[in-house]
A protein has these predicted regions:
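Hydrophobic helical membrane-anchoring modules
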Residues: 1-12, 147, 169-229
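N-proximal low-complexity "stem/linker" segments adjacent to membrane-targeting elements
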Residues: 1-33
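Acidic helix N-cap motif at the loop->helix transition within catalytic regions
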Residues: 26-30, 50-59
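Catalytic metal- and UDP-sugar-binding loop of GT-A-like glycosyltransferases, i.e.
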Residues: 67, 90-92
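Acceptor/aglycone-binding surface of glycosyltransferases and processive sugar-polymer synthases
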Residues: 67-69, 73-81, 99-174, 200-212
């Protein structure tokens, strides 16, 4: 992992926003120009070949290059590069609007939640049926195992940075979001969710937009469910 920007000073008033990125040149300008004041984007380039890193730099984002491919690898690299007390994760494909970050981050900043996840309120065409069905099945398993009232393992989430580091996250694939929830619940975290709009993404999906990608994510999450019994 390498970074091309000096770390900013952590502050309770600033939230680092980690954006795992793989070939999102078409979406990044929209995402980064809508980043609200007080939110500092960290774009983790995970092997892009379309100039995503240069576009991110041109829009003022800190860029971290993570050569090991994998969603969890990119998230972990962003976590290590972040410095703020509270951090957020979100997709870089314009399916989520950075202007909704306040909805997800405020309860964690205020100390009323330890992990806040955005439950996707999907617009037509935003969420393929196979991905939605897989997500609903996974959410039911999480509810049974943790007692939480989670309806969606959503890609926009906020968490205290040091508490996340304490979880000793190990998954470097698509099991990362589930590992965070299960380990956090085991430690007694207050896990909540708020609805956020979910739009059709810009460009071609690498995961949920294909049956193959959904199956690959399901494989990783199934492994996490078995390992964290």
């Amino acid at each position: 992992m390498t970074t091309d920007a000096a770390s900013a000073i952590g502050s309770d008033r600033t939230v680092d926003v980690i954006l795992p990125t793989l070939d999102e040149a078409g979406a990044l300008p929209w995402v980064l120009t809508r980043m609200p004041p007080g939110y500092r984007p960290i774009v983790v380039d995970n092997g892009s070949t379309d100039g995503s890193a240069d576009i991110a730099r041109g829009h003022g984002a800190q860029v971290v290059v993570e050569s090991r491919r994998g969603f969890g690898a990119a998230c972990y690299a962003g976590l290590l590069a972040s410095t703020s007390t509270v951090i957020a994760f979100m997709d870089a494909d314009a399916s989520l609007d950075p202007e909704d970050l306040d909805v997800v981050c405020t309860p964690v900043v205020d100390g009323t939640a330890d992990l806040l996840m955005g439950a996707r309120a999907a617009q037509p065409g935003a969420w393929p049926w196979h991905a939605r069905q897989a997500n609903q099945l996974l959410a039911r398993k999480i509810r049974r195992r943790t007692g939480s009232r989670i309806s969606d393992l959503g890609p926009m989430r906020a968490v205290n940075r040091l508490r996340l580091l304490d979880l000793d996250m190990t998954d470097r694939g698509f099991g990362w979001p589930l590992e965070m929830v299960l380990k956090g619940a085991h430690q007694g975290w207050r896990i909540e969710e708020r609805p956020v709009p979910y739009r059709p993404r810009i460009g071609k999906s690498k995961v949920s937009g294909t049956v193959r990608g959904t199956l690959r994510a399901g494989r990783d999450m199934g492994r996490i469910l078995r390992e964290l019994r």
